[in-house]
């Protein structure tokens, strides 16, 4: 029985300290509300009427039903549906792809959250990757753009404080006055900038306008490592600070000074996370943001560039290919199964008789590590799809 959790003191990022979420994991394990036995629905769908059954009975029933779906409609009529859950590596990258891949089940594109970040940044820097977040310790100007780091990333905040202790200035950009925004010290040159929600891109375009207008670009780096500078220059020519001020609610002088500071206080590092992508222009946010360090050459400086997720610290802990065994998806002469977008679950479930061109409709949905009725768009359509026979 687990009675205590401890962090790994040798981990380069956490250094053995657990975040509040992980510290409470055992409360969930031992919660009186935790389900310990399988429950089978006995009433109409949506009523929430269940009976307790044994594990043997539950597993046999599930296996029989899955087998019937596969034999009648094919493997792609089965949709495994999961997301980040508790962020555990095994929970997210465990044996489930291997298990369902062997059945030829439909694959899931987990596009409801983080992938937008990589897709947007990839359009600018080609890889979608950013700088090591711990390199912010070497920054002289740190922009926390749309992230409440002090509250939600306690492992990174000491790195930022260490940089500030050596003279780094902090700029917090957020529509909300967060705990991180309250941590700024204007006497030291820190600043809190509060654009209206969803208008960040306008401010970025105006910053690029100022940087190019004032000759603050790193022309040698641009010539050696970028393409399309002339097109970008023309695109931002009309995005004056005054125009951006009208869109963002941030004073033109504030935007202008931010642009000058970003280009002249070196190295300048930007830290942003998934909160910035949670609106209709999420991918474009990161595509545009990636242009700023390209204009100034900050990508080439230690402590410069854009820091995103710290997931790279766990990339080598699990041999994902050995777990997934993607070759099983095409075993026995099968083609690779189709991939369905998780954010389209409502549409997927309400088309049970799809045509041959896009494969069979879904007749079995297996959900774990997520709650699609609460987190996926078009909840009412999802409810209708789940209630069908």
Report the location of each language-model feature.
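A glycine-rich, hydrophobic/aromatic-adjacent loop/helix-cap motif
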Residues: 262-358
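Core structural elements
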Residues: 233, 256-267
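A short, aliphatic-rich alpha-helical micro-motif
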Residues: 136-137, 186, 262-263, 359, ...
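Short, conserved loop/helix-junction motifs that constitute active-site signature segments
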Residues: 162-166, 384-389
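N-terminal export/assembly segments and adjacent metallocofactor-ligating motifs
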Residues: 1-214, 251, 335, 366-369
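Flexible, glycine/threonine-enriched loop-and-boundary segments that flank and lead into catalytic domains
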Residues: 373-388
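Internal, active-site/partner-interface "lid" segment
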Residues: 216-241
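Flexible, glycine/charged-enriched surface loops at secondary-structure junctions
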Residues: 73-77, 217-222, 269, 300-307
């Amino acid at each position: 029985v687990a009675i205590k959790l401890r962090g790994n003191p040798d981990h380069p990022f956490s250094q053995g300290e657990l975040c509040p979420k992980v510290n409470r994991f055992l409360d969930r394990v031992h919660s009186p509300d935790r389900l310990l036995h399988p429950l089978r629905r006995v009433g109409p769908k949506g009523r929430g009427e269940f009976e307790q059954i044994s594990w043997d009975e539950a597993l046999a029933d599930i296996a029989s039903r899955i087998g019937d779906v596969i034999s009648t409609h094919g493997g792609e009529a089965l949709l495994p549906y999961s997301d980040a859950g508790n962020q555990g590596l095994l929970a997210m990258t465990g044996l489930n792809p291997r298990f369902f891949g062997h059945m030829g089940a439909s694959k899931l594109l987990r596009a409801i959250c983080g992938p937008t970040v990589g897709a947007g940044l990839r359009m600018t820097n080609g890889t979608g990757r950013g700088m090591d977040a711990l390199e912010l310790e070497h920054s002289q100007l740190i922009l926390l753009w749309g992230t409440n780091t002090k509250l939600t990333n306690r492992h990174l905040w000491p790195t930022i404080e260490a940089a500030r202790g050596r003279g780094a200035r902090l700029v917090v950009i957020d529509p909300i006055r967060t705990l991180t925004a309250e941590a700024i010290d204007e006497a030291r040159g820190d600043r809190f900038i509060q654009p209206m929600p969803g208008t960040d891109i306008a401010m970025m375009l105006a910053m690029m306008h100022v940087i190019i207008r004032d000759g603050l670009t790193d022309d040698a780096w641009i010539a050696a490592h970028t393409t399309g500078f002339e097109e970008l220059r023309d695109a931002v020519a009309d995005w004056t600070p005054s125009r951006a001020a009208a869109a963002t609610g941030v004073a033109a002088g504030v935007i202008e000074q931010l642009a000058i500071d970003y280009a002249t206080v070196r190295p300048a590092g930007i830290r942003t996370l998934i909160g910035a992508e949670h609106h209709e222009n999420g991918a474009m946010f990161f595509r545009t943001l990636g242009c700023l360090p390209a204009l100034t050459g900050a990508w080439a400086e230690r402590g410069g560039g854009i820091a995103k997720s710290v997931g790279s610290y766990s990339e080598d802990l699990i041999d994902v290919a050995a777990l997934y065994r993607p070759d099983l998806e095409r075993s026995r002469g099968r083609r690779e199964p189709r991939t369905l977008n998780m954010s389209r679950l409502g549409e997927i479930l309400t088309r049970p008789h799809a045509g041959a061109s896009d494969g069979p409709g879904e007749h079995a949905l297996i959900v774990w590590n997520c709650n699609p009725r609460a987190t996926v768009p078009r909840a009412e359509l999802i409810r209708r799809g789940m209630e069908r026979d």
